[in-house]
Amino acid sequence: MFRTLMNAKIHRARVTEANLDYVGSITIDEDILDAVGMVANEKVQIVNNNNGARFETYIIPGERGSGVFCLNGAAARLVQKGDIIIVISYALVPEEKIAMHRPKVAIMDENNRIAQLIAEEPAHTIL
């Protein structure tokens, strides 16, 4: 049996743009993607801390070092520039490998730079 587990998370990123006229997706700084192991076209869940919206889209790599987090297409209706979001990717992990699975979590600062990179979330973390 396989279980769906969190594979990577970008925590508390700040939306830099919302582009309604684009076809779809979320554009994310490629340096940040590399740090957590997310890739182009990967399906991700977006959680908006400001309004509680949760939705799925896919990744488009953005300019390295830019700190860009741009929601495109219909998803642009669910965020505003400056909103705090969480970007989560998941993986299907075989039951026998669950104990070895270590997701990567990037905790972002207010300028969309990685403040901390951790291999697992401690219980009762408040940021």
From Swiss-Prot:
Modification note: Is synthesized initially as an inactive proenzyme, which is activated by self-cleavage at a specific serine bond to produce a beta-subunit with a hydroxyl group at its C-terminus and an alpha-subunit with a pyruvoyl group at its N-terminus.
Enzyme Commission number(s): 4.1.1.11
InterPro entries for this protein: Asp_de-COase-like_dom_sf, Asp_decarbox
Enzyme class: lyase
Disulfide cysteine pairs (residue numbers): none
Superkingdom classification of source: Bacteria
Pfam family for this entry, one: Asp_decarbox
Ion transport in keyword set: no
Cofactor note: Binds 1 pyruvoyl group covalently per subunit.
Subcellular location: Cytoplasm
Gene Ontology biological process terms, A to Z: alanine biosynthetic process; pantothenate biosynthetic process
Gene3D superfamilies assigned: 2.40.40.20
Keywords for this protein: Autocatalytic cleavage, Cytoplasm, Decarboxylase, Lyase, Pantothenate biosynthesis, Pyruvate, Schiff base, Zymogen
Record GO terms (molecular function): aspartate 1-decarboxylase activity
Chain positions found as Pyruvic acid (Ser): 25
Biological or metabolic pathway of the protein: Cofactor biosynthesis; (R)-pantothenate biosynthesis; beta-alanine from L-aspartate: step 1/1
Cofactor requirements of the protein: pyruvate
Main location: cytoplasm
Active site, UniProt feature: 25, 58
One cellular component (GO) term of this entry: cytosol
Entry keyword Cytoplasm: yes
Chain sites annotated for binding substrate: 57, 73-75
Physiological role: Catalyzes the pyruvoyl-dependent decarboxylation of aspartate to produce beta-alanine.
Record NCBIfam families: panD
Subunit structure: Heterooctamer of four alpha and four beta subunits.
Protein name: Aspartate 1-decarboxylase
Organism: Geobacillus thermodenitrificans (strain NG80-2)
Name of the gene: panD
